């Protein structure tokens, strides 16, 4: 008698828990009530990749650019970690327009990005903020992925919202 409703309730609870929702079941004098709540996080960065695609190979000396699409206007800072674990900023506060794909091919219109050693896998992170960063978070001297990510989060903390996206490529001779 109770097996079917209990199974249905368990299935419903599983669906909501997998969807990241909170389920509250409360007994009332003559009936049970079920309410749900959820938080939906919309990413500001909808696309981020190098011009040859995520995971592509580049030779030392090749030009490289990055395609980015955001849901709102703001600024992007690009940082990277080399195969040896060194972290660096190579573009800060690049303005982007929301709702359109843009190409970032240099820190300014007259400067481009060029592949340089060391060879091996590289990871680039785009940090989106609604306003300009002040540069107070320093990435020079930071080594290792976890410390890099902690610095990015520290930089984003000054803003009511922000987003991070990563892409990877390999550098060869």
What are these regions (language model features)?
Residues 2-10:
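Bacterial N-terminal signal peptides that target proteins for export
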Residues 21-173:
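Secretory-pathway glycoprotein ectodomains that are cysteine- and/or Ser/Thr/Pro-rich
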Residues 9-20:
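Bacterial N-terminal signal peptides
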């Amino acid at each position: 008698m109770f097996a079917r409703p209990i199974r249905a309730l368990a299935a419903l609870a599983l669906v909501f828990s997998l969807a990241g929702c909170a389920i509250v079941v409360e007994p009332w004098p003559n009936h049970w009530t079920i309410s749900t709540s959820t938080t939906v996080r919309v990413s500001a960065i909808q696309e981020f990749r190098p011009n040859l695609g995520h995971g592509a190979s580049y030779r030392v000396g090749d030009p490289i650019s990055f395609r980015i699409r955001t849901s709102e206007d703001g600024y992007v800072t690009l940082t990277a970690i080399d195969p040896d674990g060194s972290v660096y900023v190579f573009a800060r506060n690049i303005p982007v327009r929301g709702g359109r794909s843009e190409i970032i091919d240099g820190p300014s219109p007259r400067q481009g990005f060029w592949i340089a050693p060391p060879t091996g896998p590289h990871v680039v992170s785009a940090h989106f903020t609604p306003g300009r960063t002040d540069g107070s978070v320093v990435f020079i001297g930071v080594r290792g992925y976890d410390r890099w990510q902690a610095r990015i989060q520290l930089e984003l903390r000054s803003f009511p919202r922000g987003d991070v996206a990563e892409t990877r490529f390999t550098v060869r001779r």
